[in-house]
């Protein structure tokens, strides 16, 4: 499963916001997020019954998620969830302090 999400923030601001998203996913769903470096994070866990195992990379105004395909029945739900979270956390109109962590 692949998701490519463009953003209008600086890479540093996007990184900071996605670190907050990682905290949210860990606190809310128990999804383990490990930052490999300033451009890559590994995700591992479950949302509902969907296994989320993949890598998120930041580069030149794009957040790219590459992960295990959960299968036909759950693919759209998993994609929608990840895209909606990226849209919410990478929205320049939303202050970082307003982004949920749990």
Please describe what each predicted stretch is.
Residues 8, 12-15, 68, 72-80:
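Ordered, soluble secondary-structure elements with a strong preference for glycine-centered loop motifs
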Residues 3-7, 43-45, 56, 67:
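Preference for bulky hydrophobic residues occupying beta-strand positions
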């Amino acid at each position: 499963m692949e998701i490519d999400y463009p953003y209008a923030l600086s890479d540093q601001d996007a990184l900071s916001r996605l670190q907050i998203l990682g905290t949210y996913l860990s606190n809310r769903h128990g999804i383990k997020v490990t930052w490999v470096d300033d451009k890559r994070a590994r995700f591992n866990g479950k949302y509902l019954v969907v296994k989320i195992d993949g890598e998120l990379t930041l580069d030149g105004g794009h957040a790219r998620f590459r992960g295990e395909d959960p299968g036909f029945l759950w693919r759209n739900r998993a994609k929608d969830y990840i895209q909606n979270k990226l849209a919410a956390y990478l929205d320049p109109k939303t202050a970082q302090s307003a982004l949920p962590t749990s």
